[in-house]
Amino acid sequence: MAKRDFYEVLGVERGASEAELKKAYRRLAMKHHPDRNPGDKAAEEAFKEANEAYEVLSDPSKRAAYDQYGHAGVDPQMGAGAGGAGYGGANFSDIFGDVFSDFFSGGRGGSRGGAQRGSDLRYTLELDLEEAVRGTTVTIRVPTLVECKTCDGSGAKKGTSPVTCTTCGGIGQVRMQQGFFSVQQTCPRCHGSGKMISDPCGSCHGQGRVEEQKTLSVKVPPGVDTGDRIRLSGEGEAGTQGGPAGDLYVVVNVREHAIFQRDGKHLYCEVPISFADAALGGELEVPTLDGRVKLKIPEGTQTGKQFRLRGKGVAPVRGGAAGDLMCRVVVETPVNLSKRQREMLEEFRGTLQGDTSHSPKASGWFEGVKRFFGDV
């Protein structure tokens, strides 16, 4: 069967650069590697074909011979004289370092056949606004995996010890022959630990770790907000084979407040006032996180008017000046009027008839309406 053109195999032009050749080969090698296509003869042949093409075209002298004589220039069995293209002369280490590093190691992180770091944990901490602003210390209970005290984390029954895995010799990896290449994979017997337990611990069933509710004290600094994380180093799950424990990340969630809304270091609230206070002005008390303060309302205040109380917000957790408290006025319409109150309001309304100087917004609005209908 005639061989395909090597450039065609890799899917590149004849003038392709070294980088383009390498990129094309990596793509094909990942696609057709036997470990990704077990039992697929077509994929195995495509993998071999890509290897052969790259082995020739990545070597400048072999590529020159191939460009001049074709397959005859690199295949001694076809009779030309540029030298053979045996597989043993190719160096694919740079390719494999990029393409198959995770693939060969079974996709597992950490050291082979040794200690493994424990997993990190996440805990959501619910806080009131006052606790978040002032800081607090809370006690939490976290379900986690801790080192088994019965076997000291070895997984073996007390008085015994794990033995070296006879399949991998204790390194946690085995070599598998895949076509022209020797591929390193996680040992299927010990699952990468390098050790075997013939008599497992009865408490942890050979795992070296047991489930436990861990009680921890968490110091919350002043100024934290929803989404902030507090890291407790070493308070995550215990490691295996003597590996270090992971970390615990306490994620803050601040509950909604009945009065205040928070935006960064600033606080916002709505202050309801009577229409009499809005018209005549006055002074009222408003709440802050530090206690009550007096707020002066000027006469003629409208709904939506915002007053700023400087420094009455939140001091940021990372330092800096405290924010402000923004008080937005809402003028309330009176309800459930008495007879006398209704009479007084009727009398008041009568004094406004035909006089728009007391309601500048209404005056402008009605003038706009007249113009609108006049244009229509």
From Swiss-Prot:
Q: Which InterPro entries match?
A: DnaJ, DnaJ_C, DnaJ_domain, DnaJ_domain_CS, HSP40/DnaJ_pept-bd, HSP_DnaJ_Cys-rich_dom, HSP_DnaJ_Cys-rich_dom_sf, J_dom_sf
- Which UniProt keywords are given for this protein, alphabetically ordered? Chaperone, Cytoplasm, DNA replication, Metal-binding, Repeat, Stress response, Zinc, Zinc-finger
Paste the cofactor note.
Binds 2 Zn(2+) ions per monomer.
The UniProt record gives the binding positions of Zn(2+) 2 as C165, C168, C187, C190
Domain J: start-end pairs: 5-70
Subcellular compartments: Cytoplasm
- Which SMART domains does the record associate with it? DnaJ (SM00271)
First-listed, main subcellular location of the protein, grouped into a coarse class: cytoplasm
Gene Ontology terms: cellular component: cytoplasm
Q: Which residues does the annotation say bind Zn(2+) 1?
A: C148, C151, C201, C204
Q: Where are the zinc fingers (CR-type)?
A: 135-213
One Pfam family in the UniProt entry: DnaJ
GO BP, one annotated term: protein refolding
The CXXCXGXG motif repeat boundaries are 148-155, 165-172, 187-194, 201-208
Note whether Isomerase occurs among the keywords: no
Subunit note? Homodimer.
Q: Which NCBIfam families match?
A: DnaJ_bact, PRK10767.1
PANTHER family, A to Z: CHAPERONE PROTEIN DNAJ, DNAJ HOMOLOG 1, MITOCHONDRIAL-RELATED
Q: Share the domain note from the entry.
A: The J domain is necessary and sufficient to stimulate DnaK ATPase activity. Zinc center 1 plays an important role in the autonomous, DnaK-independent chaperone activity of DnaJ. Zinc center 2 is essential for interaction with DnaK and for DnaJ activity.
Family membership, please give it: Belongs to the DnaJ family.
Protein name, per record: Chaperone protein DnaJ
Q: What is the lineage of its organism?
A: Bacteria, Pseudomonadati, Pseudomonadota, Gammaproteobacteria, Pseudomonadales
Q: Gene symbol?
A: dnaJ
